[in-house]
Swiss-Prot record:
GO molecular function, one term: glucuronate isomerase activity
Alphabetical list of Pfam families matching this protein: UxaC
Record-given protein name: Uronate isomerase
HAMAP family: UxaC
Reactions performed catalytically: D-glucuronate = D-fructuronate; aldehydo-D-galacturonate = keto-D-tagaturonate
Keywords associated with the record: Isomerase
Encoding gene (name): uxaC
Length: 469
């Protein structure tokens, strides 16, 4: 019987073990999409305790705790840090079968070195004290953990109005070699249907010194901010497309739509689609001219619990998978961007695994001549960021495209302890390829498949994003 979380965790064939230990394990981490707070990296934040680094802001854990009957006070409320950690420790034994159980113990093992001990009510105090003592050390600050985990690059998620002063501070610090680059997340600039849109237009106009009245004014304001981001090393954009829309409109129509919204009027769904299409097509061309990568995260159904949204706000664990069709609108959006050969490198993620084959085939329609893997089907996202979800995504990518050109894993996380998700991903990748070899579906060619694993673990992403390390 295999031991839980051994050095050969998930590596159930000899070939998988060789792939992982000889090719994957020592590869650096290129974390091209995350939600780490850049100010904590800039100031080399020292975490107060295990709650501060591990549970604070983690909606995955809160969701599991609520399911386990834990009161909200112990999730997001006013309980002490220890009380919240104790409640999490009492929940962990009930998470077997959930990726949280694997993540929890991988994160305790690295970087804290906790092995052979499972988190539970009986072990909580010992783990709390041990890890808190380690967090007082210099190698367990925000930067220290990144260095321990062999991180080479992180891409944070940033709004166009952000001043990026923290990224600038990190870039100017010659004692810290890890690249910390902004990613452009302009959702607030095109989600015209939201009540917050007009206030955001005022803020965008202020930071860009632009009076936004016409669609061309919005383009001017965004261009100035794109230039600002580019000056700070940005090469990546990210868009939350909860619903994919497409409806064309000329500039005069877009001017009218924007003017009506700024006047406080409510728009039709068709007008919303026209405006979003106009912004996304224009932005895509800007990305292409600048050599940026665009990411589309598709299919989240957000803020389902209105009572809790009013109490706690967004991004606290009340989101789920949407089932709106996306194929036709996405095809038209990408095709429109491609008309003038201004479709940038693009990564598509779907939250509904039903859409895996849709994206797996969609990327094949728009691959670029002379550019390996220009269009990417992104790694299993959010609810698919688990063993079965990763296997499904990679299997379908292999069957419908080229797994060998895949840019691999990203944490998409707010926690400095989430880098072990790259280890988890690499183990699953090696397990999958090892089984192909075991079943005679792939040759037992270690150099060939080892190079493929190495590329997916690091090199493909480094080359794709073209960021000098």
């Amino acid at each position: 019987m295999p031991q839980f979380l051994s050095e050969d965790f998930l590596l159930d064939t000899e070939f998988a073990r060789r792939l992982y230990h000889e090719y994957a394990v020592d590869q650096p981490i290129f974390d091209y999409h995350c939600h780490l707070p850049p100010e904590q990296i800039a100031e080399n934040y020292r975490f107060k305790n295990l709650y501060d680094i591990w549970l604070k802001g983690d909606h995955y854990k809160w969701r599991a705790m609520r399911t386990n009957g834990v009161p909200e006070r112990l999730c997001t409320g006013d309980a002490s840090d220890w009380e919240k950690f104790e409640a999490w420790a009492a929940t962990v034994p009930h998470t077997i079968g959930n990726p949280l159980y694997h993540w929890t113990h991988l994160e305790l093992r690295r970087p804290f070195g906790v092995t052979g001990t499972l988190l539970s009510p009986s072990t909580a105090k010992g783990i709390w004290d041990r890890c808190n003592a380690m967090l007082e050390r210099d190698d367990f600050t925000a930067r220290g953990i990144m260095q321990q985990m062999n991180v080479k690059m992180v891409g944070t998620t940033d709004d166009p109005i952000d001043d990026l002063r923290h990224h600038k501070a990190v870039a100017q610090d010659s004692s810290f070699s890890i690249k910390v680059l902004p990613s452009w997340r302009p959702d607030k600039a095109f989600n015209i249907e939201l009540a917050t849109f007009n206030d955001y237009m005022a803020k965008l106009g202020e930071v860009s010194d632009t009076d936004i009245r016409r669609f061309s004014d919005l383009q001017t304001a965004l261009t100035k901010r794109l230039d600002h981001f580019a000056a700070h090393g940005c090469k990546v954009s990210d868009h939350a497309l909860d619903v994919v829309m497409f409806a064309e409109a000329d500039d005069a129509t877009l001017d009218k739509i924007l003017a009506r919204r700024l006047a406080g009027e409510t728009l039709s769904e068709h007008e919303v689609a026209q405006f979003k299409t106009g912004v996304l097509v224009w932005l895509g061309a800007e990305y292409a001219r600048r050599g940026w990568v665009q990411q589309y995260h598709i299919g989240a159904l957000r803020n389902n619990n209105l009572r809790q949204f009013k109490l706690l706000g967004p991004d606290v664990g009340f989101d789920s998978i949407n089932d709106r069709p996306l194929a036709q609108e996405l095809s038209r959006l990408l095709s429109k961007q491609n008309e003038e050969n201004l479709l940038p490198k693009t990564i598509l993620y779907c939250l509904n695994p039903r859409d895996n084959e849709v994206l797996g085939t969609m990327i094949g329609n728009f691959q670029g001549e002379g550019m390996p893997g220009k269009m990417q089907f992104g790694s299993g996202w959010w609810f698919n960021d688990q063993k079965d979800g990763m296997q499904r995504q990679m299997t379908q990518l292999a069957q419908l495209g080229l797994l060998s050109r895949f840019v691999g894993m990203l944490t998409d996380s707010r926690s400095f302890l989430s880098y072990t998700r790259h280890e988890y991903f690499r183990r699953i990748l090696c397990q999958m390829i090892g089984r192909w070899v075991e079943d005679g579906e792939a040759p037992a060619d270690l150099p060939l498949l080892g190079e493929m694993v190495k590329n997916i673990s690091f090199d493909n992403a480094k080359n794709y994003f073209a960021i000098e390390l």
